From Swiss-Prot:
UniProt family annotation: Belongs to the NDC80/HEC1 family.
Protein name: Probable kinetochore protein NDC80
Lineage of the species this protein comes from: Eukaryota, Fungi, Dikarya, Ascomycota, Pezizomycotina
Keyword set, alphabetical order: Cell cycle, Cell division, Centromere, Chromosome, Coiled coil, Kinetochore, Mitosis, Nucleus
Stored Gene3D superfamilies: Ncd80 complex, Ncd80 subunit (1.10.418.30)
Subcellular location: Nucleus; Chromosome, Centromere, Kinetochore
Source organism: Gibberella zeae (strain ATCC MYA-4620 / CBS 123657 / FGSC 9075 / NRRL 31084 / PH-1)
Length: 726
């Protein structure tokens, strides 16, 4: 009878609740299934076929289907050969009863008691992408820099005072059984840091147990808490927190204190108002969570033989308390809604009065649009008319000026004609002579105009040549300046330079100062200095402009200088190659020395670390002894100053300690009684369950025996029984 029948067993590993979603998809335990006899068993007494109770109707809103949770099985699949009719509805597939395999539960209507927990339709918009506090995020590249001024003494004193006040407020010394001195946050010992870190982390995660050394425990915990600067903390620093590293660990303790305060505030609903300001109402979620947690706790504590009515009676107070909490939560919204409805009615009435007292808005809008269109058209027409008027005014002014000029010219022509007529009359010239003279004058005027036109063309060409010559002269001056600069750089200028060898290489433009290449002939006088020529028939030569013969002596000097520089360059290259070989040898020697220096530096660092550790231990011991001596001296002085006052204080402390001890004794007795009661209840449940299992096994054995007798006969049954006994 050691076969696994698929029933629930106390030897199976305890099933976890798995992930609980926001709508509380908490699974229902197997103990909630109602076990009652069914008529399916026929003539068999105590039939093993279990009928499941119908689904209990919930008072809350419908909940989505329960998730598929896994449970492990430790039995075999021997019963699957033909005894499926005597089993209750299995929560696992028949093909996976091997040890260590996880099977999924199939939650169906009727195989378990329906949960009273149903989903509520939240009125708050869904917030996606919730991120767990301990979820791992990609770490940024490099070691992040702490922006806090941890090296500042005033900042250290302030955060140290905050940490000390927080520990005193939450009974650090009583919980950790460790006394802290006043200077513990200025020069702490390794033991002080260990106690403070463990206590602060227990404020964040009370169920954590420290089992390793502190230098091995802290790094993974910092990664789990997602401390932003955990990469800047090494194990060697954790093993020696004093000295220069204390500011870093003081910032770590302050950050953990703030994190613990934030978690306490979250538990104490301190951020509900901030959620309300952000438009998220969490009061309903808290009511639902309290209902689910309290109701589920009582539901698990119920006896599995209770009926649906008794279960509903047990859960009814929780439903009523949830309804009352929702009524209290919704009362302010109801009053606000009433106020808003009254305000809405008042505003609607005002709108109706305004609509009655004012014309139709549609007609007004239509008229307004027409007037806007007319306004735009009038503005455009006005702008066009203004432009035309300005144009006509300017044109009329110009025409008036031209008319005045024409009138003046006409008057002058009339006067000239009258004067000429008088002169002609006085000379006695006939009209034929006047016509002939006029024709000759016109011919000469045309000749003068053609000559003037040719002269203008010649002057234009000459001015272009002058501009080109001036540009060429500017370019020549720039090239001479660039030549002189480069010659000075390569030591050719002055004549006393290294490469000049007493010769003159400096170029100069020797054009006469009184020559003006930019003066146009059209505007120049008869002087030859304003021409681009030396005289009326000769222009400037290259030798007249530059002081040196570039194509002769200067070119030969440059060729010889280039050859000499090439020889010196070849010699310098040979010397440089030799120097490079020597430098490579020196570098190899330096690398060897550098390796030796690094080895010595490593030994020095190891010695310095050992020295620092020894110094820290010695300093800590010295500080502890100094603090103890100072404390003893202060106590001695206080005892000498006022012995009677100390006696009264000690008596009062003794009275307080006695009262506290009595209270602790009473609390311990009450807790002991509560634990004894709980243990008795659990033992009773275990005994009842054991009796139930034994009874079920006996019934099952009898049922199997009857089945085998029917199918195989009494002889075969006896042989099978002997085989089973063997």
């Amino acid at each position: 009878m050691s076969q696994d029948t698929g029933l629930w067993s106390v030897r199976r590993p305890r099933e976890t609740l798995g992930g609980i979603s926001a709508n509380s998809a908490i699974p229902q335990p197997g103990s909630t299934m109602k076990r009652s006899s069914s008529n399916i068993g026929g003539n068999y007494p105590g039939s093993h076929v279990r009928s499941m109770s119908g689904s209990r109707h919930s008072l809350a809103m419908p909940r989505p289907s329960q998730p598929m949770f896994q449970r492990s099985s430790s039995g075999t699949n021997l019963v699957d050969l033909g005894l499926s009719s005597v089993k209750r509805s299995s929560f696992a597939p028949k093909s996976t009863f091997t040890p260590g395999t996880a099977t999924k539960r199939a939650s169906t209507d009727g195989d378990r008691r329906s949960s009273v927990y149903r989903p509520r339709q939240s009125t708050v918009p869904a917030v996606s992408h919730h991120q767990s506090f301990f979820q791992t995020t990609p770490a940024p590249a490099g070691v992040p820099r702490d922006p806090r001024p941890l090296k500042d003494r005033s900042f250290q004193a302030r955060i140290g005072q905050e940490i000390m006040e927080y520990m005193v407020q939450h009974n650090f010394e009583m919980e950790m059984k460790h006394v802290l001195s006043q200077n513990v946050l200025k020069s702490p010992t390794q033991k002080d840091f260990n106690y403070m870190f463990q206590w602060l982390y227990h404020r964040i995660d009370p169920s954590h147990k420290f089992q390793k050394n502190i230098d091995q425990e802290v790094p993974p915990l910092l990664k789990q808490m997602r401390y932003p600067f955990e990469r800047s903390i090494t194990k060697s620093q954790i093993a020696a927190v004093g000295g220069q590293n204390w500011s870093t660990f003081l910032g770590l303790l302050h950050w953990m204190m703030q994190l613990a305060q934030m978690l306490d505030g979250y538990v104490n609903c301190q951020y509900d108002e901030a959620c309300m300001e952000a438009g998220i109402d969490v009061s309903g979620d808290r009511i639902i969570f309290d209902f689910l947690s309290n109701g589920y706790r009582d539901w698990l504590a119920m006896d599995e033989d209770l009926g649906d009515e008794e279960a509903e009676r047990v859960l009814a107070p929780h439903v009523q308390s949830m309804a009352a909490a929702f009524e209290r939560s919704n009362s302010k919204y109801t009053s606000e809604l009433d106020m808003l409805e009254a305000e809405n009615a008042r505003l609607l009435k005002e709108i109706e009065d305004l609509e009655k007292s004012t014309p139709d808005p549609a007609v007004l809008d239509h008229h307004f649009k027409i007037m806007e269109e007319d306004k735009v058209k009038f503005e455009e027409y006005n702008a066009l008319a203004m432009q035309r008027s300005e144009k006509y005014e300017s044109r009329s002014q110009v025409l008036q000026e031209e008319l005045d000029k024409l009138l003046e010219e006409l008057q002058e022509a009339d006067e000239e004609r009258r004067s000429l007529q008088k002169a002609v009359d006085a000379q006695g010239i006939s009209m034929q002579d006047i016509d002939r003279m006029t024709a000759e004058r016109e011919r000469l005027q045309r000749g003068i105009e053609s000559a003037s036109q040719r002269l203008e063309e010649v002057k234009k060409k000459v001015s272009e040549r002058e501009a080109e010559a001036s540009r060429k002269l500017d370019e020549l001056e720039q090239m001479v300046d660039r030549y002189n600069t480069m010659a000075y750089q390569i030591a050719l200028i002055p004549s006393t330079a290294a490469n000049a060898k007493g010769r003159e290489f400096e170029l100069q433009v020797t054009v006469a100062d009184d020559s003006d290449f930019t003066t146009s002939i059209m505007k120049s006088g008869p002087s030859s200095a304003d021409r681009l020529v030396v005289d009326s028939t000769t222009g400037h030569q290259a030798g007249h402009i530059l002081n040196l013969d570039l194509r002769g002596k200067i070119r030969n000097s440059f060729i010889s200088l280039r050859k000499e520089i090439s020889d010196r360059r070849a010699t310098a290259m040979d010397e440089m190659i030799k120097d490079h070989d020597l430098l490579d040898g020196i570098k190899e020697a330096i690398e060897d020395r550098r390796g030796e220096v690094e080895a010595l530096n490593h030994r020095v660092r190891a010695a310095e670390e050992e020295y620092e550790k020894t110094k820290e231990v010695t300093t800590a011991q010295k500080l502890a002894s100094d603090a103890h001596i100072e404390k003893m001296e202060k106590e001695l002085s206080r005892m000498r100053a006022g012995l009677s006052e100390n006696v009264q204080i000690l008596e009062q402390r003794e009275i307080n300690t006695t009262i506290e001890y009595e209270q602790l004794v009473l609390q311990a007795n009450a807790l002991r009684e509560e634990l004894h009661t709980e243990i008795d209840r659990m033992l009773n449940d275990v005994i009842k369950f054991k009796i139930h299992v034994q009874k079920s096994l006996d019934d099952y054995e009898g049922f199997v025996t009857e089945e085998l007798e029917k199918e195989l006969g009494s002889d075969e049954m006896q042989e099978d029984t002997q085989r089973m006994d063997m």
